[in-house]
Amino acid sequence: MIEDDVVIGPNVTLIGASHKKEDIAKYGKVVTTTKGKITVKKGSWIGAGSIILPNVTIHEGAVVGAGAVVTKDVEPYTIVAGVPARKIGVVK
């Protein structure tokens, strides 16, 4: 779910499902083993090229730096960046 006043940069990927690499070898095909909701709350920003994984909430006013890989929730008015994304500051 994407709420109001959200800014999403170019080439952002929201991944709602994934699989373990072992599943490909075992079954010879991709079997979805992880799926979940992604929520982007009001007024948050997601920078260009970021990847958001399943079961993540980007809380209100949060900022995700370009190219970040978000593996867990981003607290309100927090700035995250990196692979995996980690807190680097707060929105003032």
Label for each model-derived stretch:
Residues 56, 67-68, 74, 78, ...:
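Short beta-to-alpha loop/turn elements within the nucleotide-binding domains of ABC transporters
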Residues 1-56, 83-84, 91-92:
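Flexible, glycine/small-residue-enriched loop-and-beta-strand segment within the central core
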